[in-house]
């Protein structure tokens, strides 16, 4: 009985730690706008934006968030002024993730909830790739995801990991960085 209570408590803490603060539809709108502030976006992307929505296998919240983001992005006419496609994928491991991003010429990688323990290895795997990593959770940004979203005093706040942005050849304009919380 005590083990069940401890497990239940642990799961409740994990769910609270990995809950999405900013609604996914708003995340999609902010992502579409932020892409246009990356000086390298069109050169990296080419004629069409390819977004990979990464979900955790066996995690219903992760799957729901990925599907919701796909629907939200599909309703937006352009990202960074370009047409776009979105694809859902389940995470296997960091090396496979990097291979998929290279093979599919991914410009944006959206990381759904459920990956707090894998963000460091994901960061290392995609550090050499020129792509914008976007986290569904604010906690992902200090650990190496380039762009994230938080709720501060009831308002959405953009978060940017500037060190990782430079590694991934993301060059946000200074005027937009003034509006974000920057991590270095």
Region locations from a protein language model:
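Short hydrophobic alpha-helices and adjacent helix-cap/hinge residues
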Residues: 2-184
């Amino acid at each position: 009985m005590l083990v069940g209570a401890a497990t239940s408590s642990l799961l409740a803490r994990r769910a609270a730690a990995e809950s999405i603060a900013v609604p996914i539809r708003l995340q999609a709108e902010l992502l579409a706008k932020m892409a246009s502030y990356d000086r390298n976006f069109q050169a990296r992307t080419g004629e069409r934006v390819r977004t990979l929505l990464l979900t955790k296998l066996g995690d219903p919240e992760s799957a729901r968030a990925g599907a919701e983001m796909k629907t939200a992005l599909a309703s937006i006419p352009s990202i960074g002024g370009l047409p776009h496609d979105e694809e859902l994928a389940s995470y296997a491991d960091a090396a496979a993730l990097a291979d998929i991003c290279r093979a599919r010429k991914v410009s944006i990688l959206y990381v759904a909830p459920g990956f707090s323990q894998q963000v460091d290895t994901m960061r290392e795997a995609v550090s050499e790739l020129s792509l914008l990593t976007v986290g569904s959770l604010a906690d992902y940004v200090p650990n190496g995801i380039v762009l994230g979203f938080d709720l501060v005093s009831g308002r959405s706040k953009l978060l940017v990991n500037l060190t990782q942005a430079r590694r991934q050849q993301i060059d946000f304009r200074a005027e937009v960085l003034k509006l974000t919380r920057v991590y270095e």
